[in-house]
Amino acid sequence: MRHRKSGRQLNRNSSHRQAMFRNMASSLVRHEIIKTTVAKAKELRRVVEPLITLAKSDSVANRRLAFARTRDAEVVGKLFTELGPRYQERPGGYTRILKCGLRAGDKAPMAYIELVGRPEAAQAVDVEAAE
C-alpha cells in the first residue's frame, strides 16, 4: 500500500529523479519557461517554489543551500539577483502550468511551466529534446 507517500515516481529510481529535477529546475530558472510533460511540470513546482522562496532573503547560508540543491552557480546568481527581488511581495505561487496538447510520438500530455511575471521576450525550451 502506498498510503501517505508523497511525490511521483515517474518510472525512475531516486537518484535519476533527483538529477532530472535538479536539471529541470536549473533550466526553468535560466530560461523562465520550459516545455515538459504535465506530470513532470506538477512535480517540478515542488522543487522550484521553495528555491524562489529561499532566494527572497539573500544570505551566504541561503546561497549555499540553493547551490546544494541546484549545483549551478549561474542559476544561484540569477535566483538571488533577479528572481528573489522580483517576487519579494508575492507569497508563493511563482509558477504557472499551461497545458499544450499531446506529444507527437507517444501522445503524452505536454505542458509549459513558466515563472509568473516573466519578461515576454523569453522563449520556451523543449526539455525532452535536451535530455
Swiss-Prot record:
Query: In terms of domain of life, where is this protein from?
Result: Bacteria
Select a single GO molecular function from the record's annotations and give it. Answer: structural constituent of ribosome
PROSITE patterns (UniProt xref) = RIBOSOMAL_L17 (PS01167)
- Which Pfam families does its entry note? Ribosomal_L17
Q: Does the keyword Ribonucleoprotein belong to this entry?
A: yes
**Disulfide bond is among the record's keywords:** no
One GO term under biological process is: translation
Q: Which UniProt keywords apply?
A: Ribonucleoprotein, Ribosomal protein
Provide GO CC annotations from the record.
cytosolic large ribosomal subunit
Q: Which SUPFAM superfamilies match?
A: Prokaryotic ribosomal protein L17
Q: How does it assemble?
A: Part of the 50S ribosomal subunit. Contacts protein L32.
Return the PANTHER family for the record.
Answer: LARGE RIBOSOMAL SUBUNIT PROTEIN BL17M, RIBOSOMAL PROTEIN L17
Identify its protein family: Belongs to the bacterial ribosomal protein bL17 family.
Q: What is this protein called?
A: Large ribosomal subunit protein bL17
> Which species is listed as the source?
Shewanella oneidensis (strain ATCC 700550 / JCM 31522 / CIP 106686 / LMG 19005 / NCIMB 14063 / MR-1)
Lineage here is: Bacteria, Pseudomonadati, Pseudomonadota, Gammaproteobacteria, Alteromonadales
In the UniProt record, what gene is named as encoding this protein?
rplQ
